[in-house]
Amino acid sequence: MSSDSSRRIQVPEELKEVLLQFSISFLVEQPPDVIDYAVEYFTKLQSERPSVSHTDQSTDDQLSVNSQDADAEPPVMASSRRKSVFAEAYDPEADDDDDGATAVFPKTDEQRARLVESVKNVLLFRSLEKEQMNQVLDAMFERKVQPGDFIIRQGDDGDNFYVIESGVYKVYINDKHINTYNHTGLFGELALLYNMPRAATVQAETSGLLWAMDRQTFRRILLKSAFRKRKMYEELLNSVPMLKALQNYERMNLADALVSKSYDNGERIIKQGDAADGMYFIEEGTVSVRMDQDDAEVEISQLGKGQYFGELALVTHRPRAASVYATGGVVKLAFLDVKAFERLLGPCMDIMKRNIDDYESQLVKIFGSKNNITDTR
C-alpha cells in the first residue's frame, strides 16, 4: 500500500470512543488479566447494545476536528513508534494524599467559562461531573509562548493536553502544514490517557497563552474520584435490605450501572403520571413522596439516605402514581435506568412485589382507600 493511500485511512470515531471507555474502565478496575477483562467487558457491552441510543452515537461525531489533528496517529507511524499506552501505574486505593494537595492555578470567571466551552465536547471531559470538572480546571496551568516556540513535536512522548487562550498555532505532519489554530482550539487530549508518540507538530506563529493539563494529574482526579464513587455505591447498596438477595458480583455490576444525579431543595425528581424510566437510591439528603388528592398534594412519606424509590412503577409497568421532591437542601441520588433495572435486579423482583402490599396499606391509612393505586412511587 502506498504512503498516500495509507494516509487516507481514518480511525472511526465510534472505535475511538469504545477504546477510550474500555481504557478508563480498565484503569479503574485494575484487573489482573487484561485479556480476560477485555472479553468480559466487551461481552457485557454487546449485551447492552439495544439500550444504546442513536443520540449518543451522533454526539460522538461532534468532537472537534481540530482537536484530533495533533493526536490522530497516522498508520505509517503505528508499527514503529507506538509505546506502552499505560506507562505510569496509579493505584487509587493506595493514594491517601489529601485532594487539597493538588495545585490550584487561579483563573478568572471568564477564563474558566472559556475552558468549559472549549472542552465540553471532548470525550474524556463529557463524562466528568461538576466537582471533577472544577478540579480539572483548577489544575490546568498557564504556559506562555513566543513566536517560533514548539508546543509539541511529532514523535515525542505525549504528556500534556492544551487549550488555547490566545495566539496563532500551526500544525504539521511530516513537515507538511495541515491546519492552523487562530486564538481558539485544543490539542493533545489523548495524552491524558495514553503514553504514545505525538502524531503531529504544533508550533506557535505568534505570542500567545495556553492552558495545560498533565496526564498524571488528570488520571489522579478522574480515577480517584471514580474509585471513591464506586466504593461509596457499594457501601450504599450493601445497606439496602432488598439487595441482600443479590450476590456480591451482582451488587458490583449494579454499582457500575448507577448514575449520579443531584437536585436542589424543592425540585421535583419524578412526576405523578409520568412514564417510569428508572429507580433511585438516596446517597444524601431526604425526599418527600406526595400524591394528588382533591386538587392538592398530600405527603405520603419521607425517605432518607440508604432508601430507594421509583422501583414499583417498573415492577407494575404503570405510570408514576406519586411525585417525589427533594427536601431539606441538595439531594444526591444514584439513578438506575429501566434497562439496567430489568437486567440486574431480577433476583429482587419478588421482594419488590411484596412491597406493593405495604404501600397499599399506607394509602388506606392516609386516604381511607387505595384509590386503585398499586404503585405509590
From Swiss-Prot:
Post-translational events: The pseudophosphorylation site binds to the substrate-binding region of the catalytic chain but is not phosphorylated. The physiological significance of phosphorylations by other kinases is unclear.
Membrane found in the keyword field: yes
Family annotation (Pfam families): cNMP_binding
Tissue-by-tissue expression: Detected in follicle cells, germline-derived cells, germline line stem cells and outer rim of ring canals of nurse cells throughout oogenesis (at protein level).
Disruption phenotype: RNAi-mediated knockdown increases ethanol sedation sensitivity when first exposed to ethanol and decreases ethanol tolerance following repeated ethanol exposure.
Location of region: Disordered: 48-78
Subcellular location: Cytoplasm; Cell membrane
Residue numbers binding 3',5'-cyclic AMP 1: 124-239
Keyword annotations: Biological rhythms, cAMP, cAMP-binding, Cell membrane, Cytoplasm, Membrane, Nucleotide-binding, Phosphoprotein, Repeat
Modified residues (Phosphoserine): 51, 58, 64, 67, 84
Biased composition (Polar residues): 48-69
Domain of life: Eukaryota
Phosphoprotein keyword on record: yes
InterPro entries in UniProt: cAMP-dep_PK_reg_su-like (IPR050503), cAMP_dep_PK_reg_su (IPR012198), cNMP-bd_CS (IPR018488), cNMP-bd_dom (IPR000595), cNMP-bd_dom_sf (IPR018490), RmlC-like_jellyroll (IPR014710)
Family matches, as Gene3D superfamilies: cAMP-dependent protein kinase regulatory subunit, dimerization-anchoring domain (1.20.890.10), Jelly Rolls (2.60.120.10)
SUPFAM superfamilies reported in the protein's UniProt record: cAMP-binding domain-like (SSF51206), Dimerization-anchoring domain of cAMP-dependent PK regulatory subunit (SSF47391)
Binding site for 3',5'-cyclic AMP 2: 242-362
Sequence motif: Pseudophosphorylation motif, positions: 81-85
GO cellular component terms listed in the entry, alphabetical order: cAMP-dependent protein kinase complex; cytoplasm; cytosol; plasma membrane
Known function: Regulatory subunit of the cAMP-dependent protein kinases involved in cAMP signaling in cells. Mediates membrane association by binding to anchoring proteins, such as Akap200. Might play an essential role in the regulation of neuronal activity in the brain.
Family: Belongs to the cAMP-dependent kinase regulatory chain family.
Name of the protein this chain belongs to: cAMP-dependent protein kinase type II regulatory subunit
Organism annotation: Drosophila melanogaster (Fruit fly)
Recorded name of the encoding gene: Pka-R2
